[in-house]
């Protein structure tokens, strides 16, 4: 990671790198972001190339002063120096990139661990509560979010009154269908992929797969093309895109099925962690759904936990609507690295 000496010197570079886009910003002062840039991952052969493009576009006065410290969150496990991204053909050595870019400090962590760091800093106007009561301040918090994949992390309290962000790969747990219809969709996915993880169905590609399975396996949902892009399914379901193929009902049902499946996975995570501090949903899909998510089967499925239905019914679920929460989390993660001496 390099030296932590004078790591509070600003500006500090933060970057949230997902499977589709890379979002960069400069932290000019504690938790104050500027020069936010969103770069399409497909436009760059490597993470370093994307970072160089962002740095090259900074105002001359900032470029002249230089950026010495950086923290990057990536949609991938971070298990050592060598990193190969799961949803993009980028691979790099953290130390080699630090040296190549001339940083004194270069922190790399899982993107959902970075987002977990942000949870204590999100304002009430950046969170939409979907059911439950009030959160318990010093209890574990669960985090998940469907986008290109399905990110999962947690924020756990310590005896010192702080929180520790824990990265995980919970998106790759085996998907468990909850009714006969979901069994049919699961079988459709299993024939194609073998192992059916939660991410196979609860992600952008998962929404596409659900839509495809509905048309392929159920007479009721024959209208429309065999396959559609996730963005189009969502837009048609929300009435934002013209329904020229007559499959609005199929798109809406695909979204509702997706939300119900997410409710199952979110509840499993909540009871595993004892997440009385709340369950937080980020990613690119759910915040986009707006009221359609609140009115979906999500909460009903979330509370469908048999003997533990009362336990999860009290747990609040929050949809994150902050514009760049991962970047705020990276600022906090950099501070945490300084405090812990790592």
Swiss-Prot record:
The keyword Transferase applies. Keywords: ATP-binding, Cytoplasm, Glycolysis, Kinase, Nucleotide-binding, Plasmid, Transferase. Its EC number is 2.7.1.2. ATP binds at residues 15-20. It comes from the Bacteria. It is an enzyme of class 2 (transferase). GO terms for cellular component: cytosol. Its main location: cytoplasm. It catalyses: D-glucose + ATP = D-glucose 6-phosphate + ADP + H(+). One of its GO terms (molecular function) is glucokinase activity. It is found in: Cytoplasm. GO terms for biological process: glycolytic process. HAMAP family: Glucokinase (MF_00524). Belongs to the bacterial glucokinase family. This is Glucokinase. It comes from Ralstonia nicotianae (strain ATCC BAA-1114 / GMI1000) (Ralstonia solanacearum). The lineage of its organism: Bacteria, Pseudomonadati, Pseudomonadota, Betaproteobacteria, Burkholderiales.
């Amino acid at each position: 990671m390099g030296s932590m000496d004078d790591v509070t010197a600003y500006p500090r570079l933060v970057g949230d790198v997902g499977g589709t886009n890379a979002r960069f910003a400069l932290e000019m002062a504690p938790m104050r972001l500027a020069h936010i840039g969103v770069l399409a991952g497909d436009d760059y052969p490597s993470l370093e190339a994307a970072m160089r493009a962002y740095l090259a576009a900074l105002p001359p006065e900032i470029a002249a002063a230089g950026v010495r410290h950086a923290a990057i969150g990536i949609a991938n496990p971070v298990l050592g120096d060598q990193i190969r991204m799961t949803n993009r053909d980028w691979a790099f050595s953290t130390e080699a990139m630090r040296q190549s870019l001339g940083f004194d400090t270069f922190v790399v962590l899982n993107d959902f661990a970075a987002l977990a760091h942000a949870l204590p800093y999100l304002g009430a106007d950046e969170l939409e509560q979907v059911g439950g009561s009030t959160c318990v301040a010093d209890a574990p918090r669960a985090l998940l979010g469907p986008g290109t994949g399905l990110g999962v992390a947690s924020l756990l309290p310590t005896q010192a009154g702080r929180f520790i962000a824990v990265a995980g790969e919970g998106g790759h747990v085996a998907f468990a269908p909850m009714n006969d219809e979901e069994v049919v969709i699961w079988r459709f996915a299993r024939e194609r992929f073998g192992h059916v993880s939660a991410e196979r169905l609860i992600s952008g590609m998962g929404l596409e797969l659900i839509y495809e399975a509905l048309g392929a396996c159920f007479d009721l949902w024959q209208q429309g093309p065999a396959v559609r892009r996730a963005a189009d399914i969502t837009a048609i379901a929300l009435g934002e895109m013209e329904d020229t193929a007559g499959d609005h009902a199929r798109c809406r049902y695909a979204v509702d099925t997706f939300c119900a499946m997410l409710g199952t996975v979110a509840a499993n995570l909540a009871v595993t962690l004892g997440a009385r501090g709340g369950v937080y949903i980020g990613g690119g899909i759910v915040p986009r759904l707006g009221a359609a998510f609140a009115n979906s089967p999500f909460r009903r499925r979330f509370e469908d936990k048999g003997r533990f239905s009362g336990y999860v019914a009290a747990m609040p679920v929050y949809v994150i609507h902050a514009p760049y929460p991962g970047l705020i989390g990276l600022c906090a993660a950099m501070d945490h690295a300084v405090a812990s001496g790592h």
